[in-house]
Amino acid sequence: MKKVCMILTDGFEEIEAVGTYAILRRGGLSVDIYSLLDQDATGRFGLTCTKLNPFSQLNAADYAALVIPGGPEYKTLEASPAVQALIKTFIEAGKVVAAICAGPTLLGHAGYLKGKNYTCFTSMNEDFGGIYHDDYAVTDGNIVTGKSAAATIDFAFAVLEAVAGQETADKTKKEIYYK
């Protein structure tokens, strides 16, 4: 079974994290959630996730993909040298890096969106050197980006397809009566 890791910190966007987790699990992927703070993480609307894995124990070699949900505290992730190093490790290994809403700004500021097709929360779009698309989800090579909380399901299916293939994504869509 392919494995995905997700990073949370306080202020994460609940629907982006939990919705993506649920779709990936329905698609047969193993998903481990890590707390940047090595403790419980509370989302922007008060949902607290417990029993999270400590970020300090995350080993990139164990995973096929990295998922970065958005939320108002995305800058905490961006300011972490350890998170930046993890993203670089995944990118350089050609593994899937997926970020939604505010999450893609971490990739953009680090230069990973240069020459790439991408999306992100509209008001957070800067000149990242790539081609911005006003779509719910955009995949370009090993980078998957999502626009906003409303785009969570489309984003999650794009991640599932990038990791497990189109057949698995289509089967999972059918199982939940997704368009």
Model-identified regions with their sequence ranges:
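Extended, subdomain-level signal for the structured scaffold at the beginning of enzyme domains
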Residues: M1-A93, L106-H109, I131-D134, I143-K179
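Short, glycine-/small-residue-rich phosphate/pyrophosphate-handling segment
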Residues: I100-Y136
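Cytochrome P450 catalytic-domain "roof"
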Residues: T139
